[in-house]
A protein has these predicted regions:
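Sequence/structural segment immediately N-terminal to covalent heme-attachment motifs in c-type
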Residues: 18-40, 123-148
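Sec/Tat signal peptide C-region and signal peptidase I cleavage site
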Residues: 11-19
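Gly/Gly-Pro-rich "capping" loops immediately C-terminal to redox-active cysteine motifs
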Residues: 23-25, 36-71, 146-177
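Short, structured interface segments
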Residues: 33, 97-120
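Axial heme c-ligation environment in periplasmic c-type cytochrome domains
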Residues: 46-62, 74-104, 122, 155-163, ...
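Short, solvent-exposed mixed-charge patches
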Residues: 212-213
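Bacterial N-terminal signal peptides
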Residues: 2-12
Length: 213
């Protein structure tokens, strides 16, 4: 029993130390100047939203996959076709790069930032016809989001690209976001699908989106 307790103590201490190093690297890189890491969401008006320099990260650990975060921070590439909250400026992909160690440390720190609204949904990413029909026809998600079809990037420019969503997004977060996007982004053009789609349809759509390559 003592060995179990000691093992837990050392594991918890290591995890805490790792998170501490990640927070230090996060602060040293100046990430807090653009990214909110304490929830809940603060913007209340369009003016508030437009004042943001980058996406909030207070639920990063619920939204992203750690492997993606570490790789992206070391070699960042545009996720949004357009600059953050811009309809006219193309995203030039000028996000600062971190060293391999700092990227891993910051990714570990960000993965500890969880949103209680994101529950274990049990959803598995998968190609499914019902989800595809909702995405392509019923809601025309292509209008705002890019996807890759037969090796070609197609779709709208106003929202983040969903090409590569399978490597990037947690299906639990996708489901929570589709169900109640205002929790994460109070000022948003994204529809509240809880009043449009059934729970089963939201799950089908979340499984489909989180499987997009």
């Amino acid at each position: 029993m003592l060995m179990i307790a000691l093992s837990f103590f050392f594991f918890a201490s290591s995890a805490f130390a790792g998170a501490g190093e990640g927070k230090k690297a996060f602060d040293a890189a100046g990430c807090a100047a653009c990214h909110q890491i304490k929830g809940p969401a603060k913007e209340k008006t369009i003016k508030d939203a437009l004042a943001k320099k980058g996406p909030e990260l207070w639920y990063a650990g619920s939204k992203f996959k750690k492997e993606f975060l570490g790789g992206w921070l070391e070699d960042p590439r545009p996720i949004r076709p357009m600059e953050f909250y811009s309809l006219t400026k193309t995203n030039q992909g000028n996000h600062p790069k971190l060293s391999g160690k700092d990227a891993a440390d910051v990714a570990g720190f960000l993965m500890g930032l969880k949103a209680p609204e994101v529950k274990d949904s049990g959803i598995k990413p998968q190609e499914n016809q019902r989800g595809r029909i909702i995405f392509v026809k019923k809601q025309s998600c292509y209008g705002c989001h890019q996807v890759k079809e037969k090796g070609v990037i197609t779709g709208g420019l106003t929202g983040p690209s969903l090409a590569g969503a399978a490597e990037r997004l947690s299906p639990d977060w996708v489901c929570a976001y589709l169900s109640n996007p205002r929790v994460f982004k109070p000022v948003k053009d994204m529809p509240d699908y809880a009043g449009i789609l059934t729970d089963e349809e939201i799950r089908d759509l979340a499984a489909y989106v989180s499987n997009l390559n």
